[in-house]
Amino acid sequence: MVPPAVLLPWVVLPLLGVQGGSGSKQEENLLVLTVATKQTEGFRRFRRSAQFFNYKIQVLGLDEEWKGGDDKKPAGGGQKVRLLKSALKQHADKEDLVILFIESYDVLFASGPTELLKKFKQAKSKVVFSAENYIYPDRKLEAKYPPVRDGKRFLGSGGFIGYAPNLKKLVEEWKGKDDDSDQLFYTKIFLDPEKRENINISLDHRSRIFQNLNGALDEVVLKFENARVRARNLLYDTLPVIIHGNGPTKLQLNYLGNYIPQIWTFETGCTVCDEGLRSLTGIKDEALPMILIGIFIEQPTPFLSQFFLRLRNLHYPKQRIQIFIHNHEEHHSMQVDSFVKEHSKEYLAMKVIGPDDEVENAEARNLGMDLCRKDPDCDYYFSLDAEVVLKNTETLRILIEQNKSVIAPLVSRHEKLWSNFWGALSPDGYYARSEDYVDIVQRRRVGLWNVPYISSVYMVKGKVLRSELDEGDLFHGGKLDADMAFCHNVRNQGVFMYLTNRHQFGHILSLENYQTTHLHNDLWQIFSNPEDWREKYIHENYTAALKGKLVEMPCPDVYWFPIFTDTACDELVEEMEHYGKWSTGDNTDSRIQGGYENVPTIDIHMNQIGFEREWYKFLLDYIAPITEKLYPGYYTKTQFELAFVVRYKPDEQPSLMPHHDASTFTINIALNRVGIDYEGGGCRFLRYNCSIRAPRKGWTLMHPGRLTHYHEGLPTTKGTRYIAVSFIDP
């Protein structure tokens, strides 16, 4: 028994702002028939575009088992002919009724019924099929096709329009099976001259009505004009009414569907971003959706301590969060263990797979996702790689409220175009740059974007993992990397992956050039990840000092301002002590040119720990700008021959004799706390009889070097005092 056709109630409801025309009697004689056995995301996109233009739609076969074959192969589709033949019985005698039969999963309307009917009647045929460049499924039939002087030669079965009686004639001879080829059936009718003339069939050779994308990707561009957007065929200079992402072109349809119909324009921005939201407003913490966060540390990663701090600071109740951690790197085991020990009880649950478990990337990602899939209480799975710097504490709530099956927040490398999504794929499935990629990354176009590839950070609905994505192994796929395999498998299930750049979320660390040979490797990241280096190591009040605030002058022409965080001070001291090769404090010093030091200290030079380039970058980026403000008219390139950390101890070297520095100006940064780590110490400028006896940790003194500022280091009486010194522009 053939199921009855299903008429969905939404199709007749008028929408505000629709572009479909006035609802004339002519348009009332238009009916759109489509086949959809399941309400996929592709179908819902088709439905929305039909709603927008106020088309009258009848859906055939809804909830019926699909037996029409694999849609990835050209053969099959006979089930659609059977359903159409059955539906046409009730319309056979309606001579004025025009019926459009169209696919739904990979189709968009770009214009309304008025334009469609006008172009159909201009064709002066009773039935018009879409046309394309390729013949299938039987290439031997090519010679039988009528020659075409201008346009596409071959019939495409994905869309056709005609009068009801003529369409009844078209399908009345169908007696095939559900998995027989509808394409071959219609092709043979068209190639029979008698039937073609009797039914009065023509092809839409110039894509005036139907734009099949297969074999025509280079022909189609977006046309923005007067707050509207259309697909334009450059080859024929036409504006098709219907866009069909047939064959391997579904990804291009996804791209076009980010704009058509009026989804996004330059004048309006995103018009659908607030549709179908899931509001979390007013929901008590204990009633919020449960999230499983999968954390993946797959390679040595800088700033991991900051990563865990940001994780803890996410604005979401920890008792509604479970955490799964896969740490592949022994280098990070101590940091992971510390986080688990200190914070595991704060969360609903926590599971860790470490280096000793020898679980590889793809398998670990499958395990994390499977924990959510198998837990009926898991509402969302949030995958988060350790190189993602997630600064927006509202990220989880934002993604949940957007209410998509799969959604990723945009993150990119600092001031780079490298990001966590691709706007297009090359023919072999790798990266290709879409026309809008740069605008999306730089947020010149803001909205929700259906994209073919996401990575690093994304959210998946738990119910989707238990339905469309219930396959337990999503992260393997031949020779593909785990992230590419995941996206490939998600796309194959017809699930859309969205990217949102409606908010600033954060960025991605560069893992290139990350060294693991030091005690505190993050210190060396000033080149690769300057923004994160600044956040960790530069004092929070440095910007105020740069504006002239928080700058003190305790002695004439001696400036005092914040520069380092406590972490920077501690790690620099610990790095020097870890290196351990302190100088002896003698005048003889092979480290300097000439081998003689007039005013020796017990110290370690920056170049001894391989930190000279990084220190120069620090001086150039942070000391030079403030120098030029404090000493107007002087412009420094922060050249230096000596940069070092000095250690003062009562039983070692407690003080330093009066001297001039071999510099134009000097910086002297206090690296620990007077009264806590040591007693005494400080600096006295003899010419001014002015002393600074309580240096503040992380603050620097800046003063002229040779000629005017003759000074001495005051005795350290207890503990150990550390300072970082640079003689600049010697």
UniProtKB/Swiss-Prot annotation:
PROSITE patterns: FE2OG_OXY (PS51471), LYS_HYDROXYLASE (PS01325). It is a peripheral membrane protein. SUPFAM superfamilies: Nucleotide-diphospho-sugar transferases. One of its GO terms (molecular function) is L-ascorbic acid binding. SMART domains: P4Hc. Residues 639-730 form the Fe2OG dioxygenase domain. It is found in: Rough endoplasmic reticulum membrane. Residues 1-20 form the signal peptide. Fe cation binds at H659, D661, H711. One of its GO terms (cellular component) is rough endoplasmic reticulum membrane. Glycans are attached at N200, N403, N541, N689. Pfam families: 2OG-FeII_Oxy, GT_PLOD, OGFOD2-like. The keyword Glycosyltransferase does not apply. GO terms for biological process: collagen fibril organization; peptidyl-lysine hydroxylation. The active site is at R721. Its cofactor is Fe(2+); L-ascorbate. CDD domains: GT_LH1. The keyword Flavoprotein does not apply. Homodimer. PANTHER family: PROCOLLAGEN-LYSINE,2-OXOGLUTARATE 5-DIOXYGENASE 1, PROCOLLAGEN-LYSINE,2-OXOGLUTARATE 5-DIOXYGENASE/GLYCOSYLTRANSFERASE 25 FAMILY MEMBER. This is Procollagen-lysine,2-oxoglutarate 5-dioxygenase 1. It comes from Gallus gallus. The gene is PLOD1.
